[in-house]
Amino acid sequence: MRPSPGEVPTASQRQPELSDAALVSHSWAMAFATLISRITGFARIVLLAAILGAALASSFSVANQLPNLVAALVLEATFTAIFVPVLARAEQDDPDGGAAFVRRLVTLATTLLLGATTLSVLAAPLLVRLMLGTNPQVNEPLTTAFAYLLLPQVLVYGLSSVFMAILNTRNVFGPPAWAPVVNNVVAIATLAVYLAVPGELSVDPVRMGNAKLLVLGIGTTAGVFAQTAVLLVAIRREHISLRPLWGIDQRLKRFGAMAAAMVLYVLISQLGLVVGNRIASTAAASGPAIYNYTWLVLMLPFGMIGVTVLTVVMPRLSRNAAADDTPAVLADLSLATRLTMITLIPTVAFMTVGGPAIGSALFAYGNFGDVDAGYLGAAIALSAFTLIPYALVLLQLRVFYAREQPWTPITIIVVITGVKILGSLLAPHITGDPQLVAAYLGLANGLGFLAGTIVGYYILRRALRPDGGQLIGVGEARTVLVTVAASLLAGLLAHVADRLLGLSELTAHAGSVGSLLRLSVLALIMLPILAAVTLCARVPEARAALDAVRARIRSRRLKTGPQTQNVLDQSSRPGPVTYPERRRLAPPRGKSVVHEPIRRRPPEQVARAGRAKGPEVIDRPSENASFGAASGAELPRPVADELQLDAPAGRDPGPVSRPHPSDLQNGDLPADAARGPIAFDALREPDRESSAPPDDVQLVPGARIANGRYRLLIFHGGVPPLQFWQALDTALDRQVALTFVDPQGVLPDDVLQETLSRTLRLSRIDKPGVARVLDVVHTRAGGLVVAEWIRGGSLQEVADTSPSPVGAIRAMQSLAAAADAAHRAGVALSIDHPSRVRVSIDGDVVLAYPATMPDANPQDDIRGIGASLYALLVNRWPLPEAGVRSGLAPAERDTAGQPIEPADIDRDIPFQISAVAARSVQGDGGIRSASTLLNLMQQATAVADRTEVLGPIDEAPVSAAPRTSAPNSETYTRRRRNLLIGIGAGAAVLMVALLVLASVLSRIFGDVSGGLNKDELGLNAPTASTSAASSAPPGSVVKPTKVTVFSPDGGADNPGEADLAIDGNPATSWKTDIYTDPVPFPSFKNGVGLMLQLPQATVVGTVAIDVASTGTKVEIRSASTPTPATLEDTAVLTSATALRPGHNTISVEAAAPTSNLLVWISTLGTTDGKSQADISEITIYAAS
């Protein structure tokens, strides 16, 4: 057992939390390390079997099990369930951040392990006899010799568990993930040395001084020591003191009952292992090796499929079980059961049919001959079904432990071990072939887990008491039955084909190569049948998988096609498979719960819908965009699961206080300057025996909340008492929008409960104008609303691009339609702050952070929608803005105190659109409902579209000519000439239009996930001024003589391409490195810049910078030397200025001349969705 990185200490002394991109990078690194560990570990087992053969491998396998058995009994079994939570609590509560607790823990663990290691080495002959029985076929002296050399691993196995737990609580996951790889590499190297050492392994008699024996035993133990050494180095790098400190912490004593239960659980399970090994070793010399290798083969697909599924579901399942949220637990059980069954049942069918071929393909090498590989294959076929009950038992145990019922699993393990022992005792009497006994032992093991699953089901049903008396819903049962039927049909047909085609001859005559070919044929037979049956039965996971395959194929085709089509249409992307879930809010301090389910679309609809686009936001009229919303038709919703960080410029996760909106005018900051610790965890009953404070988590970028489920990425503002965050769902590897409700815990319970209840009702609104609510949680310090992440830009970012009026009002219709649907459902959207609103990449204005306060009403929504439209039109916010500033400037007001109409600010805004924005913002504007507002928006859009259509040019009156029967030659020639001129002009216009369209499409589809601008969102009409370069500021151009990359805190970014920023060619550019962290400055280094050396000392007037990135901020600095040592050696000429994609001009107020000008990137933006800045041209103008 290995500790889980589930809980992280939050005391001030703890290590800093990982940043958002660092988390993603570490997650991928851990996944890669796990894959390498499994590959090298299995290669090690195969090599060992091939070198030693089945009989000798049995001796080594039994001896190598002993250190794991002893370590599990002494320490490992209790460490994950007991020590890790206590360690996390110590780091939170202790003044020294848990340093003394860690020292006591390591001292106690080392003492116990040293004693256990010494005793186990001394008792090696007894332990071997316990495992082999009284009359084994396995070489007992050789096994004992190996045991003497391998049992010292007990010490390092136990310490590895301790060190992993300490590192995990410090957010250090790399070394624990790679340490097993080091162990496997050392073990493989040991096998190479074993082959190189001359002589033979002494078997009869066994000599402890035999070179090969010592190399194999000591080398294997050295690998485990190397694994622990890697962890110890990481411990020292974290400056964690391990100096001995004697004493037992009182917190450990409280967990004595649970520790006793865990030890008893492991002891009973190890009893079944001992009985199985004794019977296997008595039956045949190869028995233990086949018995153990069978289990290793079964764990390969389980580790890649079953563990992945369980890892996704178990964190939420544990939280809900700990919170005693029975409906949520039932929903999670149903989801986990469904995902487990649909992935493992086909795997079991394939392994059952192809078992003999699998054994030969994997192990028919060297001294592990074809006969032993065949028996191993038979064991795989007989015990493959074990995967399913094994996974279900793990699910059930997690629920019991989360509900603090450690003694209940004892009943399950007693049943499992009892059936397993009974079946193991019967195995030698079932078959007359001693070599097949190991296969029937695997069958007995599976029957034991099956019995445990059945007993666990009834115990869980009695404990949870589900409505209707069933833990699994009808939908889940149907999916399981369909999957079973499809797997049975596919397996039966594959077995018949295997017999009729004589595929077994491939294994018999071609060995492992023939077995691989045989498995390929079986897979080609089974896969189409499984796919056809599940797709015809409309299993949602199958349809989602089909969509994913289609998307992958299409993306590969598009990569080889023109650049203008290198991105899939959103409608072709597969959506996530979701399931209807029964949810309720956890009761706040004894209050009544809200029995409001979160409604989702049926899985079939979700799988069928995929990622459909909303109405496009363009300047041309669209009937679908206008009347679809009016009719209330259910529009497909975009799903934003891709990792795309949209950090608002200049936003800082500052404190949020709670003044009344009327008390703060637009742009005012709250007075509260400190945010206290905030606890976010599943609600549970207070501990009667402990008064320990709750787990406190500081709301800062990189912090983990909800037991590590969500990692905070970027703060997006807030309005009292709410905070808006972009976060990463680490379980599902997708981004989400988190709205923290009353994180400081000042609202009354009834107000908080009413807020969460109203927000829960928003989950029923299925409109593109409101982000889909995924979860609503009542925590110990407020509430948490989890919604889908809306890819695109904030309202302020999009307003800053000056979108066209027609595009703006068309984009607003999605939000108005969502408000209309919400008001009809009896709930308001609470559009009270510009930071709540985002513009999606599909051109929809969306309520991105749902959370409806009790005082919210439909009239406030109308004003909020009008204010959002007003902001898109003139880049001003017309309403009072409480909380954290959004970046929008306040609107100017007329003599009556009303915001000035947008048309008075910009004469190019159509009167109808301006009137809608102005009237909806005013309290007495006459717009009383969202449906009226939506209708006015559609009418204004239609009128604006008609006024933009050019009428025909009136021709001068021409006297009517007398009609003739046939045109004369002069008229015919003139008409022919005019026709040719018209065709030529039309062709020229068409060619220019096609070139412009290709350029626009290339920009849009070539950078969908990159920076935002008005053309990509379809919010701006093309104008001549947008493509023309800005007029040159006064003063002469100063051409730099040299440019170098200035990076005092790290390596220079692409120094060889620095000249491209001043070469006068906008098509070339200097790019920074691509950073994994979306905000690398100043966390990774303080920044990077370009040092431009001027031909002579010059008073700089303006600096023009052309960039392709979004969100980049630069400072203009001067230096006395071209190579200053630090950034402090330069002088700031202009403060940080946000750059827009395209041409930017920065005015420099410098009185003194300078010969060295530094363009310093203080904030890195994004280019094509990557954390990278791209500067194509820098032009310097002297002061006039």
UniProtKB/Swiss-Prot annotation:
Bilayer topology term: Multi-pass membrane protein
Descriptive protein name: Probable peptidoglycan biosynthesis protein MviN
Keyword RNA-binding on entry: no
GO molecular function: lipid-linked peptidoglycan transporter activity
Source species: Mycobacterium tuberculosis (strain ATCC 25618 / H37Rv)
UniProt KW Acetylation keyword: yes
PTM-bearing positions, type Phosphothreonine: T947
Extracellular side: 63-67, 129-145, 198-212, 276-294, 365-374, 431-435, 498-512, 1001-1184
Start-end of Polar residues biased regions: 561-573
Similarity field: In the N-terminal section; belongs to the MurJ/MviN family.
